[in-house]
Amino acid sequence: METVIENIPPAKPKWLKVKLPIGQKYTELRGLVDKYSLNTICTSGSCPNMGECWGEGTATFMILGNVCTRSCGFCGVKTGRPETVDWDEPEKVARSIKIMNIKHAVITSVDRDDLKDGGSIIWMETVRAIRRMNPNTTLETLIPDFQGIERNIDRIVEANPEVVSHNMETVRRLTREVRIQAKYDRSLEVLRYLKEKGINRTKSGIMLGLGETEEEVYQTMRDLRDANVDVVTIGQYLQPTKKHLPVKEFITPELFAKYEKYGIELGFRHVESGPLVRSSYKAQKHIL
């Protein structure tokens, strides 16, 4: 009897292999992170671009703990009952940025649907603390959707970071499978609302390789432009563990280049599109 093997994941292509991070700036920052036990997504997420970003003086920090109230099929962050809020966290993050001498900081967080404010007060206080301690550091905030509650989003607007980002993550058809507790249109409305309230630069990101079609990617990019989003990042989805959604396809560099060209034609200020692109890749140039 012939054995049929199903759902064999595609082999990882050569273009996803990266060099080990090197360089004086990287070595200095790595030493500081280890010495002071600083919490960066760059290290905890084993980002392939860590060496390049640190070399340019950019780093990403996660606030509000490391346990998320949502269980997205793509994300490697732990799901469950989050820790209590650390009200000293804003000062700790600001101090980390000062120690590392970061020129451009990206702040992100888990979803905190357990909190009435969605964590927005800590978000606002973190931005303010960074401003006080690091007046020359520019900021990007990669925020959750706050369940679309405007008063919580308004706290981000009031803090006025240079860039506010909220990721769509995938195309409309796959949203329920990929982000079960999120809504495609709600995310678009968050991005549209941020722009309407006066945020200078808005940004979003999507992952490819989850089974989307080219036309669905184009439509998502059009939806983002219709919401007046300025910057889009497009990268390859990589499965964190076997419990997460499988990779359906590895997108070629040529197709990523095609999406970049289309995004520029649509009028995005910046388009980062490539296999290793992540939300905060080249983030420092997105304020320009």
Curated annotation (Swiss-Prot):
Locations listed in the record: Cytoplasm
Protein's UniProt keywords contain Iron-sulfur: yes
Positions of [4Fe-4S] cluster 2 binding: C68, C72, C75
SMART domains membership: Elp3 (SM00729)
Gene Ontology annotations for the cellular component aspect, listed alphabetically: cytoplasm
Main location: cytoplasm
Record's cofactor remark: Binds 2 [4Fe-4S] clusters per subunit. One cluster is coordinated with 3 cysteines and an exchangeable S-adenosyl-L-methionine.
Pathway noted in the entry: Protein modification; protein lipoylation via endogenous pathway; protein N(6)-(lipoyl)lysine from octanoyl-[acyl-carrier-protein]: step 2/2
Domain of life: Bacteria
Keyword Transit peptide attributed: no
EC number(s) stated in the UniProt entry for this protein: 2.8.1.8
InterPro entries, per the entry: Aldolase_TIM, Elp3/MiaA/NifB-like_rSAM, Lipoyl_synth, rSAM
Disulphide bond pairs: none
Enzymatic reactions: [[Fe-S] cluster scaffold protein carrying a second [4Fe-4S](2+) cluster] + N(6)-octanoyl-L-lysyl-[protein] + 2 oxidized [2Fe-2S]-[ferredoxin] + 2 S-adenosyl-L-methionine + 4 H(+) = [[Fe-S] cluster scaffold protein] + N(6)-[(R)-dihydrolipoyl]-L-lysyl-[protein] + 4 Fe(3+) + 2 hydrogen sulfide + 2 5'-deoxyadenosine + 2 L-methionine + 2 reduced [2Fe-2S]-[ferredoxin]
PROSITE patterns: RADICAL_SAM
Domain Radical SAM core: start-end pairs: 54-269
Molecular function via GO: 4 iron, 4 sulfur cluster binding; lipoate synthase activity; metal ion binding
Protein family (similarity comment): Belongs to the radical SAM superfamily. Lipoyl synthase family.
The protein, known as: Lipoyl synthase
Species the sequence originates in: Flavobacterium johnsoniae (strain ATCC 17061 / DSM 2064 / JCM 8514 / BCRC 14874 / CCUG 350202 / NBRC 14942 / NCIMB 11054 / UW101)
Species classification: Bacteria, Pseudomonadati, Bacteroidota, Flavobacteriia, Flavobacteriales
Name of the encoding gene: lipA
